[in-house]
Amino acid sequence: MSSSAECRPIGWGGWGPDPNTSPTRAAIKWFADPRSLHHQQCACGLWNARRAMQWVIPAPPRIWIDDQPRMVKLAYILGAVTVFLTSGNAADVSPTSSVAASTTPSAADSLSSLGLSLPAGNVLVGNNETFTASSPYYEPLIDEAWSGNCRLNASCIVTPKSAQEVSLVIQVLSILDTKFSIRSGGHSSSPGFSSIGSNGVLVALERLNTLSISADRKTLTVGPGNRWEAVYQYLEQYNLTVLGGREPVVGVGGFVLGGGLSLFYNTNGLAIDTVTRFQVVTPNGTIVNATPTEHADLYKGLKGGLNNFGIIVEYDLTTNTGIDVWFEVKNYTRAETPALLAAYATYLQNADVRSNVEIQANPAYTVVLYGYLDHVSAPSAFNAFSTVPSVSTVYPPTNASLNEVLLEIGTAGVTGSSWTYTVSFSFKVTNPDFLQESYKTYLEAAASLLPSGVLLEYVPQGIIPNLVTKGQAQNGGNLLGLEATPQVWGEIFAQFPATVSQSTVASAVNDLLAKITSSAESQGVHLPYIFANDAGPDQQVLRGYGEDNLKYIATVAERYDPKGVMQKLQNDAYFVSKEL
């Protein structure tokens, strides 16, 4: 996909004029996650590739093959899938059940009966047509990955449409010792985490797009193949919402498993804490419902354990009736940003739990969203910021519905073919000092990278104690090991052209992270938590939860995946086996 030559990346994944020349217009994207998919429409006339895909790609095909000469034998093993689907479904039972035990030999025997001897990495499962790289299906599916450096050419792509098909896929990949990667929406900056190259199979979950609401309208069942845009649109008819992505085109799966900061995260807590049921396909093919009372150990493990246990094929999320919001968006100059951060520190000490302030800084200016969960006029919650002069108003004070805000303003921008890299860190906020210091350190690094075409952004996401205590009180709590104190979950986000090496950017960003971390430790404000949704590929997310929680995740992973399929065959992730 290509973007207009006039478009340049700005904060929160948006696009617009060069931020050095027009901060007001460039701030068209104010609150979205700082990584939005390139499948959107912008003022430059780019088409919505995601929507086009809904009719360009027909439902039946499930397999795409990149290297046709090397992978041509795949067509001859496809008959194996019918044995599983006709001999019985993997049931919702324990991993040691007779059903689970019987499904694996069936798939293995079927492959053996074909008389084929294929090397690991040269095998894919499925029951429909296969396509070469020249087909119209393969490249659009690869381009679903949001960041350019994550658009790896997998040997094959599988798009299962049911838990039973996912069960078969994971069994055969395991039997054949084939590397794989799992993709929900592909909104990652880490190559290999939801993508894979010619050494393996991409399991794309986009057809797992269930959306249904319970009779009492308190629970939404959602498949990981959905993007938040579809979820919000579905819920509009019920005047409800859920804790979902600030950018509507982000996929459901990775957002929820990573924790998930919604627009009013300090009011409602993390998305992961609103999950009442995970439907999981474990590596032996068993389909398990994990709830607070059923497979409770797995349920608890998934409240922070990411994709160490299996493939999540369905989520039950608690719905929310609080959809009336007030918001305003302003731009501030670089010179005023230290004063703005001082006001932010004051605000975080005693924030109104119905309010939200989101800040994103780039080298030229800083954009701020002020939001309040109700229809109000000039809420006093933001008085701390009243003395800091803004340079312009992007969106004037407005009352709207939360879904309207997310669907309309949240899709106002577009990203192109930029590559990205992110890291995450956290620190306590007791006064403005470290917030201002971290911003100054960031500016120095950003200035050194800008001449080479690298745009570095700093997103200090302020967290108040209510987010932590809300999570501890919901559905048995989580494993994140959070401290109930005012804090910041900082993100350093880099966008850069493919002409700049990722290793160069990663080295510079990691050096910046090391400086910020070292200074935070010396000042006694460092926190070990690393927010998974913003973390870098080399960070140890699970270790940041604390030793006890890390060991618990390892125990659950061993129980549900004794052969270590998710640790050994999954292409890349925050593996518990690497962090012990």
From Swiss-Prot:
<keyword id="KW-0560">Oxidoreductase</keyword>
<keyword id="KW-0285">Flavoprotein</keyword>
<comment type="function">
    <text>FAD-dependent monooxygenase; part of the gene cluster that mediates the biosynthesis of yanuthone D, a fungal isoprenoid epoxycyclohexenone that acts as an antibiotic against fungi and bacteria. The first step of the pathway is the synthesis of 6-methylsalicylic acid (6-MSA) by the polyketide synthase yanA. 6-MSA is then converted to m-cresol by the decarboxylase yanB. The cytochrome P450 monooxygenase yanC then catalyzes the oxidation of m-cresol to toluquinol.</text>
</comment>
<feature type="modified residue" description="Pros-8alpha-FAD histidine">
    <location>
        <position position="187"/>
    </location>
</feature>
<dbReference type="InterPro" id="IPR036318">
    <property type="entry name" value="FAD-bd_PCMH-like_sf"/>
</dbReference>
<dbReference type="InterPro" id="IPR006094">
    <property type="entry name" value="Oxid_FAD_bind_N"/>
</dbReference>
<dbReference type="GO" id="GO:0071949">
    <property type="term" value="F:FAD binding"/>
</dbReference>
<dbReference type="InterPro" id="IPR050416">
    <property type="entry name" value="FAD-linked_Oxidoreductase"/>
</dbReference>
<protein>
    <recommendedName>
        <fullName>FAD-dependent monooxygenase yanF</fullName>
        <ecNumber>1.-.-.-</ecNumber>
    </recommendedName>
</protein>
<dbReference type="GO" id="GO:0016114">
    <property type="term" value="P:terpenoid biosynthetic process"/>
</dbReference>
<feature type="domain" description="FAD-binding PCMH-type">
    <location>
        <begin position="150"/>
        <end position="322"/>
    </location>
</feature>
<dbReference type="InterPro" id="IPR016169">
    <property type="entry name" value="FAD-bd_PCMH_sub2"/>
</dbReference>
<comment type="pathway">
    <text>Secondary metabolite biosynthesis; terpenoid biosynthesis.</text>
</comment>
<dbReference type="GO" id="GO:0016491">
    <property type="term" value="F:oxidoreductase activity"/>
</dbReference>
<dbReference type="Pfam" id="PF01565">
    <property type="entry name" value="FAD_binding_4"/>
</dbReference>
<feature type="region of interest" description="Disordered">
    <location>
        <begin position="1"/>
        <end position="21"/>
    </location>
</feature>
<comment type="similarity">
    <text>Belongs to the oxygen-dependent FAD-linked oxidoreductase family.</text>
</comment>
<keyword id="KW-0274">FAD</keyword>
<dbReference type="InterPro" id="IPR016166">
    <property type="entry name" value="FAD-bd_PCMH"/>
</dbReference>
